[in-house]
Structures are given as C-alpha cells and as structure tokens.
Amino acid sequence: MKWYTDYLSAYEKPYSELPPPLTNRVKKRIRELKHPNPLVSVVAIAHNEGNRIFSCLWSICENNCHFPIEIIVVNNHSTDNTESILKKLGVTYYNEEQKGPGFARQCGLNHAKGKYCVCIDSDTMYPPLYITTMTKALQQKGVMAAYALWSFLPDKHYSQTGLFFL
C-alpha cells in the first residue's frame, strides 16, 4: 500500500462525510502534538481548502518525527468552511486577511515558536518522513533553508519518488 492511499480516501471529501472515529483520532493527535517548546513549527497556509485540509493535517499528524513540533495553519481569507474545520479539529490557526501566499506564510512565521520552520501547503499530503527529512536538512551546518518538491500523486510530470532538495 502506498503511503498516501489512506489520506487520499479523505481528499476532496466534505468534512461532514468523514467517519467520526477518523476525525476524532486526528483531533486527538493534534492535541498531543501541541508543545509549548517545539523544535519545529509546521506552518500550513490555506485558502478555501475545506475539502482538502483534513488530508493534509492527517498526514502531518502521522509523520514519523521524534522531536516536539507545533502545527500552525493560516487561514488566508477563505470564504468556504476552512475556518470551521480548523475549529472542529482544534488546530492552532490564525486568520490572515491580506490575500496571497506571501502574507499567509509570513503570518505563520510570525507566530511560530520552533527553532526550525517547515512551510507547507494545505492541499498536499505529506510522506511519513517529510518533517524529519526537512529538519535534518535544516540542522546541517551552514544550511539556512531547505526546499522540497514532492509529488504526492504521481503524474506524467513527476514520479512518486519526486522528493528533491535543492
């Protein structure tokens, strides 16, 4: 089974149609991951991602990392039910009214408490070692930033092994 198969079952699905045992499990994991002193802040930006953000947060909650993290979502002027879902899940979020990914990422970074920040998009599902891989890259001497291209659903442009560091 590919790592994204489970997450794909919730992708593009209205939150109201997701099984309560699953949403409760993700809510619980979000609570468990909240740390007052995180090493890593995972900052997700969202604009009208009501049917996709659950898959993203589910994949982040199940990432294999053995250090404290915090998850921050920036709701960037959404007009759908994105904010309602964030409230239901109990994830830390902030509203950014200035439209655009730059404003949203900056808002998240302004609230981040971690030594390292991993910026993600909320319409994407992330592989099990994504946070650890990015953090290891950032911890290398002399490294100031890391970038990854991940094709979570292989297509003709990107293979399923499309994780690259530049």
PLM regions with names:
Residues L57-W58, E83, G114, P128-Q139:
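Short alpha-helix within the catalytic core of nucleotide-sugar-dependent glycosyltransferases
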Residues E96-A112:
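Glycine-rich, basic loop-to-helix element that forms the pyrophosphate-binding segment
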Residues L129-Q160:
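Conserved donor NDP-sugar-binding/catalytic core segment of glycosyltransferases
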Residues S59, N75-E83, T124:
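A conserved acidic beta->alpha catalytic loop
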Residues A44, P68-H77, Y94:
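Short beta-strand/loop segment that forms part of the nucleotide-sugar
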Residues C117:
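Short aromatic/hydrophobic "clamp" motif used to bind/position activated sugar donors
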Residues M1-S59:
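N-proximal low-complexity "stem/linker" segments adjacent to membrane-targeting elements
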Residues N51-F54, T79-K87, L129:
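Acidic helix N-cap motif at the loop->helix transition within catalytic regions
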